[in-house]
Amino acid sequence: MREYCSENGLSEGWDGLNQVCEDDGGTELLPWSIIDNVTDAEVKSWPILTYEDTLLGAEFNTSVSVDQGLFQIGYQTIFDWENQRTKRHNYGYALVGFWGLIVLFGTMHNFIRYLMNSSILRSKTMARCQSFIERYFAVPPILTMRKKNRIFSMPSTPRLQAIIISIYFIISIVLMCVDYHAFSENLYFTKKSTQLWRYIGDRAGALVINNLPVMWLFATRNNLLLWVTGWDFATFNTFHRWIGRACAIEIFLHGMAVCIYQYKELGTEYFLPLWKDVDWYMGVVAACSIILMTLFASAPIRKSVYDLFLIVHQSFAVACLVGLWYHLPVDGPDYVNFIWPCIAVWSFDRLVRIVRLLTWNKFASYSSAEYNRDGNVIQLRTRVRRIASPCPGSYYYVYGWRSLKFWESHPFTLSGWNTVKTADESYTELIFLISVQSGFTSSLRGQLLNHESPETDSSSAARKACLSVEGPYGSNFCPWRSETALFVIGGAGITVATSFMQDLVDLVQSGMHIDQRIKRVKIVWAVKNPAFYQFVYERYMAAWEAVFASTDIELSLDVYLTMLSKMDSDDEMSLPEHRNEPNESTKNMDTVISPSSSSNSHITTEKVPSGEAPTNAGTGILKTTFVQGRPTINDVVRSQIETLRSSEEKQLALVGCGPATMAHDIRLSFVESSNDAQVAVDFHLAPFGW
């Protein structure tokens, strides 16, 4: 060291070697002072150790000096190892930085949008930039062909999300494939191949560890980034799933690379005993947990057995963290620190959930549930504290405390609310409309049918329920700033429309609707079961008639009965009839023709013979039209655009909620309508499923 190192280099190198001894052996090097009395003449008399001697395993009983060649090889070995350690740290931080930049972009966009909506900032340039982003990136789906999407059932993923995910994977692949330096005379490895396998395995593991806190953060519903960026939970959940898939690939590569390295470098004799080491087999537990967690999180499994998915997913998440806790210390304490953010994020999310539950719900709160057999729909009503006004379009997580799975919670969109304030009590009644599927809703239906009262109407079953809600969640949107609000709804997504209409009802009753620009509201609803429509009309829409009678706001409803499109053309089917009879002033009302549908349109208030045009079946306030078949969404939106071209405001609020295929078409319709320079379209697509 005296011969090849400078004074500063000697001190740094000695400190580095001493640190290695402390970390790996738990001891310190002997002090440098023990060789202070060694002279240069004595050093020259020592044998010279060469690289060839190390290969032959030569033994010396005296002190030796290192030749120039071996020193250079040793220097290159240590330098290359430290260089690879630094690179895998930096590359892992680069992935975290990538998501930081994405969140920063979303935050800036959300802030600018807030300034523009609040009239603080009015800039044509900023408006054009925002319109450009929404038209070409934020809203359009990956595929722009409707028929292709229906044939291959491709998801309606927004283009910007797809671009972000693609860039993330490209960066991950590049960081995994570049900047390796292997040489044959490495003192740590016997072969170049084992050297590469070790470097690849270590880098893959480092990328996984750096990804974990981000993946955990994006999975929580009480994520502060939701508020900062204005993105919905579905966006972060999409990112969470793709980060998880990247982690599964990287952890598989890490495990295979390290196993190949250990087997080739050590041989079977030393490789097999490794499986008895705690850090080794717990690493296998963590790797298998991540891979299985990703496989069981596939869409078919989530939809078919969601309850099982939830238990398995959380169990594997815990097993992953426990496995990493025992596996990572072998590489030092640096990587163990990445476990704590995951625990902190999870704990914060659960704490906020508990706070929300205690804040909103009363200990002796009243809840009820009613099941309608014909519509196969459940209406939940639960009373909560009057803390804040309910937000239209928001959703809550519902807990069923009498269930054996009381820890589960399921999200449902708020369909309406009632505010009660008397001398004795004050509360808000939240109303949810739930289409019965498998899992929680099916179990709830079974409970209602099992406890059915003889006095209850044969078409429904109702009872008190022990329920609590946690929320609200979801992004804010106000369609009443536009002259026309168009709701394009599919199936149970009607709760989005009824929720916004409840907000408008409150504005009308308080007289605050005059501060809004809204003049026309049109709801286009595609529904399979006519009985579902009848139930919604009786419980929600019938009340709109009296409220809007004193206003100049036009209400219209187009109901597309998709079940009829599957029937034979010779079949006839009774359509729902409103219980309230039209008054004298509406008997001679002109027929309201809806935009074209994807099948032949024919309708009447009683029977549906083939080949007839749609006929109005509503009263004077809510003009209702029934149409057989599915709506052609592009034609629906285009007809509203044509109407607005001759108006003063020329602004349309387009709100959509429906299955993946409908959401895909709604996005495409917005893109096409946004090309019209005369009419401004404000777009909002509410989540249909989770």
Describe each PLM feature range:
Residues M1-A58:
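Soluble extramembrane regions of membrane proteins in the secretory/endomembrane system
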Residues D40-Q72, N110-I151, E429, V608:
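Extended, low-complexity, polar regulatory segments
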Residues Y51-T77, V318, Q437-T441, G446-E452, ...:
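Reductase modules of NAD(P)H-dependent flavoproteins
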Residues N83-L101, I133-R353:
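Membrane-embedded alpha-helical bundles of multi-pass integral membrane proteins
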Residues V103-K124, L217-L225, S298-S304, S347-S365, ...:
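Transmembrane-helix exit/juxtamembrane "anchor" motif
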Residues R122-N149, Y366-R385, K566, D570-S596, ...:
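Non-transmembrane, juxtamembrane loop and terminal tail segments
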Residues S298-R302, D307, I311, S315-H327, ...:
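Membrane-proximal cytosolic interface modules of multi-pass membrane proteins
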Residues S367-A462, V527-K528:
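Ferredoxin-reductase
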